[in-house]
């Protein structure tokens, strides 16, 4: 069976992963040799608790694809401020630099207010 990392990277070429959400996941998981190697703290940095599952909530590729499919039409807004992230590297969404720990990645600000 393919590793989840291989599955995601290969799937990045499909329409599923042409969404910004999919590109983010493909980029993030590429830093890990295996899904289980992603540290729980890193997962908490990526997601706010507002109805977005954490990385370690996905036990297999099927659940991951379902999540991407369920969110493929979601517009993502990001903050335009420099924040440190877990890998000390930049990541751009629509030309804007974001950090992995920004809670606005999935549409919420620090206070949990929905942005879109």
Residue ranges and their predicted role:
Residues 4-11, 70, 80:
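Proteolytic processing junctions in secreted/extracellular precursors
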Residues 6, 19, 60-63:
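Intrinsically disordered, low-complexity segments used for protein-protein interactions
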Residues 14-15, 89:
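Residue-level detector of beta-strand structural context in well-folded domains
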Residues 15-19, 26:
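A short beta-strand micro-motif
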Residues 25-112:
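Acidic, low-complexity, intrinsically disordered interaction modules
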Residues 115-116:
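Short acidic DE-rich linear segments
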């Amino acid at each position: 069976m393919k590793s989840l990392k291989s599955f995601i990277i290969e799937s990045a070429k499909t329409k599923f992963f042409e969404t910004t959400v999919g590109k983010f996941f493909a980029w993030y998981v590429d830093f890990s040799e295996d899904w289980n190697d992603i540290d729980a703290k890193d997962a908490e940095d990526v997601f706010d608790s507002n109805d977005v599952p954490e990385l370690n909530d996905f036990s297999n590729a099927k659940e991951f694809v379902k999540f991407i499919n369920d969110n493929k039409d979601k517009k993502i807004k990001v903050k335009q401020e420099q924040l440190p992230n877990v890998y000390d590297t930049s990541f751009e969404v629509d030309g804007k630099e974001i950090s992995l720990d920004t809670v606005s990645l999935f549409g919420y600000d620090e206070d949990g207010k929905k942005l879109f």
